């Protein structure tokens, strides 16, 4: 059987950040931004999961008590747990879809609850005129709701609609919005998706009057001049409508799922209007197809990305202690096999420009059979695995002007617990099926990098990766 390999001369990013230097706020060095994305943790899901049909946001109620929000079948659910990432408890319905003919006749989705005083305020995505099997037909709009305990929510008040009428056989309207609270400004900003142009827009309202539709104004021709209900709006481009606020950098964070960009795209803005996009994806992927006949067959699927403060809840974050959430369908899965994933993020400005801004954690897991799996992907059968250690950080895209190698993961056709990491094309002819690209490595040594080696475990009878030639005393170098 042909064995593929990764040369021990490939190099990946160091585990440790460079020393921080103070950068003047008025001169932000975009290429000095350094982001480390940690291993993905599967916290909920499996066959016939009823929810996970929206961005997953979390609020903190008290010490050791958090509440997250999911949706499915047109209704919104709350899930309570002791930590932001501990979301395995039963889901409770907290908001139901509206009556026939209403803006929410097809469903409601609670997005991005934020705390204002003693009240939790949430954007509520609404849909009407739906016929999903007819080209995904639906018409989107947005409401706002509030709650004192995160369980009892008032019926949403519609505050944002499109000037266009519903269309047959396609998505229309404006929706899928997320809220962000501006520090020291007294405004709530709502970033939304406009399917007719496949772009994003923004509206805002004073915190003191967010429940009044007339208070919400869309950005149009550079000013907050248009009514959010039925008004026109400027295009922000395709930055995404999943947002948060980075307090250390005083910038809005926007996330988008963009296969043409190469994965989860991160954009930042200091004025709520003009965004720049980080050149590297946070998590790489090249396909994101919702075709029910293709899901799980040719690749995995990432959907509904969100921003969560893992320590305090909400979506206002610091350099560390926050993460992204998303719904995940693994390679070989179906639309009913959805998993909720939390993935920690550390982000800061360093003293010099970076060749690559993002590093993605490569982690070794041990199966109860003794076999190792080394991956950057979510491990969905997590109860069968023990997390062992982070090996290094991989690149999330090729670096221009420097030789890199694409790294892919594959699984043995005869043994679903036997995984192989190889360079691109190495799965072919090896008796394995390709799962996905899990990152890139430098072909030759670079500053602040470490080598990785392919090793063989006689106990598990499979290959794994290590950052040292001693293979962490778990096996021997594989020189094939």
Regions flagged by a language model, labelled:
Residues 55, 108-110, 174-176, 238-240, ...:
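Conserved positions at the start
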């Amino acid at each position: 059987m042909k064995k593929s390999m990764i040369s021990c001369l490939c190099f990946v990013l160091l585990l440790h950040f460079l020393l921080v230097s103070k950068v003047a706020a008025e001169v932000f060095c975009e290429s000095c931004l350094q982001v480390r994305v940690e291993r993905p943790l599967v916290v909920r899901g499996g066959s016939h999961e009823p929810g996970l049909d929206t961005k997953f946001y979390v609020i903190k109620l008290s010490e050791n008590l958090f509440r997250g929000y999911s949706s499915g079948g047109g209704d919104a659910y709350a899930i309570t747990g002791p930590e932001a990432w501990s979301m395995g408890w039963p889901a409770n319905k907290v908001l139901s879809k509206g009556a026939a003919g209403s803006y929410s006749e097809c469903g409601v989705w609670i997005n991005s609850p934020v705390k204002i005083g003693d009240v939790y305020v949430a954007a509520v995505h609404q849909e009407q005129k739906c016929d999903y099997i007819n080209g995904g037909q639906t018409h989107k709009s947005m409401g706002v709701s509030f709650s004192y305990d995160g369980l009892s929510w008032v019926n949403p008040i519609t505050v944002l609609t499109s000037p266009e009428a519903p269309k047959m056989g396609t998505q229309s309207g404006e929706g899928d919005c997320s809220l962000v609270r501006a520090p020291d400004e007294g405004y709530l900003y709502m970033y939304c998706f406009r399917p007719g142009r496949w772009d994003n827009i923004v509206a805002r309202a004073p915190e003191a009057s967010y429940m009044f539709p007339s208070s919400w104004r869309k950005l149009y021709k550079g000013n907050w001049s248009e009514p959010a209900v039925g008004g026109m709006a400027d295009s922000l481009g395709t930055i995404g409508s999943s947002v948060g606020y980075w307090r250390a950098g005083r910038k809005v964070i926007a996330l988008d799922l963009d296969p043409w960009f190469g994965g989860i795209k991160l954009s930042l803005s200091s004025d709520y209007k003009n965004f720049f996009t980080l050149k590297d994806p946070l998590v790489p992927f090249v396909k994101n197809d919702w075709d029910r006949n293709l899901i799980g067959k040719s690749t995995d699927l990432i959907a509904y990305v969100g921003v969560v403060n893992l320590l305090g809840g909400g979506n206002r974050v610091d350099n560390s202690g926050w993460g992204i959430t998303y719904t995940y369908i693994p390679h070989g899965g179906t639309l009913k096999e959805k998993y909720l994933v939390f993935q920690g993020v550390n982000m800061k400005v360093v003293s010099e420009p970076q060749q690559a801004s993002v590093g993605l954690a490569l982690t070794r897991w041990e199966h109860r059979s003794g076999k190792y799996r080394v991956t950057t992907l979510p491990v969905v059968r997590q109860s069968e695995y023990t997390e062992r250690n982070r090996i290094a950080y991989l690149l999330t895209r090729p670096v221009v002007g420097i030789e890199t190698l694409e790294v892919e993961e594959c699984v043995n056709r005869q043994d679903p617990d036997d995984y192989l990491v190889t360079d691109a094309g190495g799965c072919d002819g090896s008796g394995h099926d390709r799962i996905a690209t899990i990152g890139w490595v430098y072909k030759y040594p670079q500053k602040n990098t470490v080598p990785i080696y392919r090793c063989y475990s006689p106990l598990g009878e499979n290959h794994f990766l290590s950052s040292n030639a001693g293979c962490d005393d778990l096996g021997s170098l594989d020189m094939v």
